[in-house]
Curated annotation (Swiss-Prot):
The glycine cleavage system catalyzes the degradation of glycine. The H protein shuttles the methylamine group of glycine from the P protein to the T protein. One of its GO terms (cellular component) is cytosol. It comes from Serratia proteamaculans (strain 568). Keywords: Lipoyl. Binds 1 lipoyl cofactor covalently. The lineage of its organism: Bacteria, Pseudomonadati, Pseudomonadota, Gammaproteobacteria, Enterobacterales. PANTHER family: GLYCINE CLEAVAGE SYSTEM H PROTEIN, GLYCINE CLEAVAGE SYSTEM H PROTEIN-RELATED. InterPro entries: 2-oxoA_DH_lipoyl-BS, Biotin_lipoyl, GCV_H, GCV_H/Fam206, GCV_H_sub, Single_hybrid_motif. This is Glycine cleavage system H protein. The modification N6-lipoyllysine is found at residue 65. The gene is gcvH.
Length: 128
C-alpha cells in the first residue's frame, strides 16, 4: 500500500500539494504515481515565472515505462523548481514527498485547494 501523508492535499491526477506559507505551495507526484511509472529517467519541469491554470499540464515525468504529463493542482505562478531532478530524476522515486518534489507555485486562488482531495479520499480513489 502506498504512503499517503495526511497533511497533504491531492489531485485525482496523482499530484500532491503542501503549504509552505505565504500562499506558496510545493507540488510533487504521489508515491502511488511513481510506483506506477517506475524508475524515473528524466523530468521536464516548468519555467520559473510561468503562470499555470489548475489542471493545466506543466511538466513531464519520463520513466523507463512511459512519459506522463504532470498537471498543476492549483492555479498560480511557478516560483521555484527542483533543479536537483535535472541530474537526479530518481529522487522522485526515492523521496516523492521530500527531495523528489517537482516545483513550487504561488497560488492565485487559494480557494482552489478546497477542490483537492484529503488523504482519506485520495487513498480511496487509488484503492478502487
Amino acid at each position: 500500500m502506498s504512503n499517503v501523508p495526511t497533511e497533504l492535499k491531492y489531485a485525482s491526477s496523482h499530484e500532491w500539494v503542501r503549504s509552505e506559507g505565504n500562499g506558496v505551495y510545493t507540488v510533487g507526484i504521489t508515491e502511488h504515481a511513481q510506483e506506477l511509472l517506475g524508475d524515473m529517467v528524466f523530468v521536464d519541469l516548468p519555467e520559473v515565472g510561468r503562470t499555470v491554470a489548475a489542471g493545466e499540464d506543466c511538466a513531464v515525468a519520463e520513466s523507463v515505462k512511459a512519459a506522463s504529463d504532470i498537471y498543476a493542482p492549483i492555479s498560480g505562478e511557478i516560483v521555484a523548481v527542483n533543479g536537483e531532478l535535472e541530474s537526479s530524476p530518481e529522487l522522485v522515486n526515492s523521496g516523492p514527498y521530500a527531495e523528489g518534489f517537482l516545483f513550487q507555485i504561488k497560488a492565485s486562488d487559494e480557494g482552489e485547494l478546497a477542490k483537492l482531495l484529503d488523504a482519506t479520499a485520495y487513498q480511496a480513489s487509488i484503492d478502487e
